[in-house]
């Protein structure tokens, strides 16, 4: 994971992006923001009450006047600008202007995503404090998904010198065949941004139809659907993870370009994805980067509950990197 992050960090040091850390009073978010600044990765902006942030800076052993930018909804001009932005977006879905003002004033995720949407910051990292689904709901009020993409979570696993991308680890409970296809196509876009040649395996507890169960039907349908798309990458499935990753299975399945070579694993459902990455982290000693929020129309990342400062820092770096390498306007 270090090589990937080193490459990203080298890149963002040059561009010095402005990154919002939404829960500026949270100890772990604050530590990550301070590390972001001290490592010269970019310019952190904290959302929080100034006196509370200063208190927290003292609590983590820094001078309360440590030079870091703090913003809050006391900034009247911004507040009016963000309320207007939100109201324009939501007036047709029954939101009143005063409700938009209330959201902008009281919700840091809303304020932070408005900062990015209005160009007052380049990227944002949020979370570590709230439930993931609630945060996504708030984000999607301000930010649309990318045209033709769905929003999902992608986690990078780095183990024994190999990097594997796992999707969807965070958002869609039971993806349909069509959603699995969208997740696969978006995952290859991301893998290429990180410099990988995508090789996609659709995972299951069965390999090429044995044993066939009701649980594997949508995965097989996804493969059939993939054949109707004009894609420029190799994919195959359904298959078990060992078949996807272990080269010694190549001779058993000589007809497949993916067996033993996969670097993108499309999971059949959220529970299997989530269990897999947590097991790998805890028991398999894999390094995790992410989950990255894919398909959102702005460079915003959500840190899961119990994220360490270094995990939050990685997400901040990736958000800054995304704001540089992804064209969000198109």
Where are these regions (language model features)?
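Anion-binding alpha/beta catalytic cores of soluble intermediary-metabolism enzymes, centered on
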Residues: 1-330
